[in-house]
A protein has these predicted regions:
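Long mid-to-C-terminal assembly/interaction modules of large eukaryotic proteins
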Residues: 321-402
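Electropositive, glycine- and tryptophan-enriched low-complexity nucleic-acid-binding patches
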Residues: 1-37
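A eukaryotic "domain-edge + linker/cap" signature
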Residues: 20, 28-352
Length: 402
């Protein structure tokens, strides 16, 4: 509906589309008036993701709804005036226009089209002012009902933003505990020759795609050979919901196999050495601090993210109206508080889905849960990292508002 993502352009697209739909309904005899203001006055809510342009669009749309309401109220009030009463108001407005133009001489120097435009704008503003005066005569309750326009954010995006906040907040944990070795830095190293000779060319892009596809295929074949089925690594290159958390779960579940695979790759290379990226990955897999983060993210994904999405988007969801999910969202925060107070519900011999999972149902990926428990004894700070993640996630700005 819009050629770009500016909020103003999107609003214009909405207005144009509603006008088209409403006119079609009028031509089809489904509505008695070809006036889209009837639609906008009935609209009471807007549902979108949490992007800044969408939140601004909500504000603009609310103002548009209010503007149209005041116009209709003004028109109704004007119809109740006598001709002389309305003519008097227009005359007073015209006098103001003449004064703003510099007096009668300045007014006459304006073109006919410009004078007509200013008079038309004055009449529109007069209608709005009368409508606003009529609105102000309503009680506070009536005003609230007239201007009712709610915004609800996308649950999926809200959880994604909260999860991202928790991940970013992990850096704070290591900064606050300098006595503990932080995750191993994994610096990039660009292929300078490729950049100089073919940066941005189609050939370079195709070569990169073929390389990535080849590595993925080799990994799938290796997993199929080792465990009897292949695994597609989550597409973390794209903005796909929960792909990063799912990737952490996959890595920790098959950590030994990933390390074994990279060793296999190294042994089968003519140079007998991994490239920079492959060596980075192998170093990260061996890094104890990185394993702490992989396990903490996996536990959060299993305990909160998956059951949360089951409730708001799953086939057995109890409610499909976001306005009725306020109690559920409060329960999410309450459960996170429980896990902060009792991390043993997720880590340790007494950890279980009954106490640890938001919905107390079986783990979506029990293999990932048990893999974390296997590595937990060798991760002395896992509980502290997990609690820090949960605290940061709970306090991400706006987390309590859905």
């Amino acid at each position: 509906m819009a050629v770009n993502h500016t909020s103003e352009t999107q609003l214009a697209g909405w207005i144009e589309s509603i006008e088209d739909f409403f006119h079609l309904a009028y031509e089809s005899k489904l509505v008695s008036e070809n006036d889209t203001r009837t639609f906008w006055n009935l609209v009471t809510g807007f549902h979108s993701d949490h992007a800044a342009d969408q939140q601004k669009l909500f504000v603009l749309m609310k103002k548009w709804k209010q503007q149209l309401d005041r116009e209709k109220r003004g028109e109704r009030a004007i119809r109740g005036l006598t001709d002389n009463e309305y003519a008097c108001l227009v005359f007073q407005g015209s006098q103001v226009l003449v004064q703003k133009a510099g007096g009668p001489v300045g007014w006459e120097q304006l073109s006919f089209e410009e004078r007509s435009r200013r008079i038309m704008d004055m009449k529109k503003q007069l209608t709005k002012d009368i409508g606003e005066a009529e609105f102000q005569r309503l009680s506070d309750v009536e005003k609230s009902e007239v201007d009712l326009f709610l915004w609800a954010g996308c649950c999926m995006h809200k959880e994604m933003n909260a999860f991202k906040g928790g991940c970013v907040g992990l850096d704070e944990f290591w900064d606050e505990h300098p006595e503990i070795s932080s995750p191993l830095p994994l610096p990039n190293r660009d292929n300078a020759a490729t950049i100089q000779l073919a940066s941005g060319t189609a050939a370079a892009t195709r070569a990169k795609t073929r390389t990535e596809r080849g590595a993925q295929d080799t990994l799938r074949f290796y997993f199929d050979y080792k465990i009897g089925f292949n695994l597609a690594f989550p597409d973390t290159s794209n903005t796909r919901f929960q792909s990063h958390a799912e990737a952490c779960a996959l890595i920790i579940t098959h950590l030994d196999l990933f390390i074994e695979f990279l060793t296999y790759v190294k042994l089968n290379k003519g140079s007998g050495a991994l490239n920079h990226m492959e060596q980075n990955v192998l170093n990260g897999l061996h890094d104890i601090a990185t394993r702490h983060e992989l396990c903490a993210i996996t536990l959060y994904w299993l305990a909160i993210s998956i059951p949360y999405m089951r409730e708001v988007r799953g086939p057995n969801a109890k409610e499909d109206n976001i306005l009725k999910l306020d109690g559920f969202h409060r329960r999410v925060i309450e459960h996170i508080d429980i896990l902060i107070a009792h991390p043993e519900f997720l880590v340790g011999p007494n950890a279980s889905a009954i106490n640890g999972s938001l919905d107390s149902l079986s783990w979506e990926r029990p293999d990932a849960f048990y893999a974390v428990q296997t590595y937990a004894p060798g991760l002395p700070h896992l509980t502290a990292v997990l609690v820090h993640f949960l605290n940061i996630r709970k306090n991400v700005p706006g987390s309590e508002v859905f």
